[in-house]
């Protein structure tokens, strides 16, 4: 069966002694899991779609595709940056980090959507099969997951509260908990904007890939609110590209 083949492949990977090679193979393995299963690959929805039946791949087909895709990506990156010191971690909480000794030219991110989707749950199967996540680790991950409902009782910046107040008042009519979660999301994004602003060089740019949402029948112009917060911090909004 596919599950048996996945476990056999994982067993072979576990026997690799070189840590870098093993890490790369585990990444390729993790990315190969969903195409083999009935889970959706291009969606983070934690359920199986009955409307659009999925054509699955064999373990070999999926792993070979994943391996080649990641090898191509890492080769491309290596052509721009070489050496063991090519990557420098500057924090593990996107809403709370500071590095006065680090200066960057450009930051690019695609933050979570405001709908509080449990991203940790969506990657839990891959993490479990790779042996790098359990319930305790998942719980800790959710504590620092921007936009997660666990952060809805955090202390909110007054400026953020004022910006989101019109939407907050409409959402709370339907669900006060969701309204607080949305408010906490923008508070997290405000903190992230502040952190990134402080590590950007003069003239540096921050590119954010984000989508607007409708929460409890209330349309939220997420990109406009983030832009307004960024402007108050000191950023200059040079435009946006919108597509449907």
Predicted regions and their residues:
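Flexible loop/turn segments at secondary-structure boundaries
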Residues: 96-97, 115-117, 214-218, 244
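Acceptor-substrate binding/catalytic loop of class I
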Residues: 123, 178-187, 209-224
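SAM-dependent nucleic-acid methyltransferase catalytic core
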Residues: 2-109, 114-121
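Short glycine-centered segments of the SAM/dcSAM-binding site in methyltransferase folds
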Residues: 24, 204-205
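Helix-to-beta-strand junctions that scaffold the AdoMet/dcAdoMet cofactor pocket
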Residues: 200-202
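Class I S-adenosyl-L-methionine
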Residues: 229, 233-244
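SAM-dependent methyltransferase catalytic-core segment centered on the flexible catalytic loop
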Residues: 114-195
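Short alpha-helix
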Residues: 191-194, 221-233
């Amino acid at each position: 069966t596919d599950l048996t083949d996945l476990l056999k492949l994982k067993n072979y990977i576990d026997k690799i002694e070189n840590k870098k090679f093993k890490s790369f193979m585990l990444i390729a393995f993790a990315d190969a899991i969903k195409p083999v299963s009935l889970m959706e690959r291009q969606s983070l929805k934690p359920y199986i779609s009955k409307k659009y039946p999925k054509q699955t791949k064999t373990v070999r087909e999926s792993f070979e595709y994943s391996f080649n895709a990641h090898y191509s990506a890492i080769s491309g990156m290596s052509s721009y940056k070489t050496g063991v010191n090519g990557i420098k971690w500057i924090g593990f909480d996107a809403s709370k980090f500071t590095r006065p000794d680090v200066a960057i030219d450009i930051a690019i991110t695609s933050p979570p959507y405001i709908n509080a989707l449990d991203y940790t749950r969506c990657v839990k199967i891959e993490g479990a099969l790779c042996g790098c996540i359990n319930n305790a680790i998942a719980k800790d991950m959710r504590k620092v997951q921007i936009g997660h409902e666990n952060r809805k009782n955090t202390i909110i910046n007054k400026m953020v509260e004022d910006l989101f107040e019109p939407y907050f008042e409409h959402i709370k009519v339907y669900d006060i908990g969701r309204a607080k979660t949305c408010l906490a999301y923008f508070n997290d994004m405000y903190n992230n904007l502040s952190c990134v602003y402080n590590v950007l060089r003069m003239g540096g740019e921050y590119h954010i890939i984000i989508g607007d949402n409708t929460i409890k029948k209330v349309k939220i112009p997420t990109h406009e609110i983030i832009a307004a917060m960024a402007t108050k911090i000191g950023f200059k909004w040079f435009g946006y590209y919108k597509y449907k």
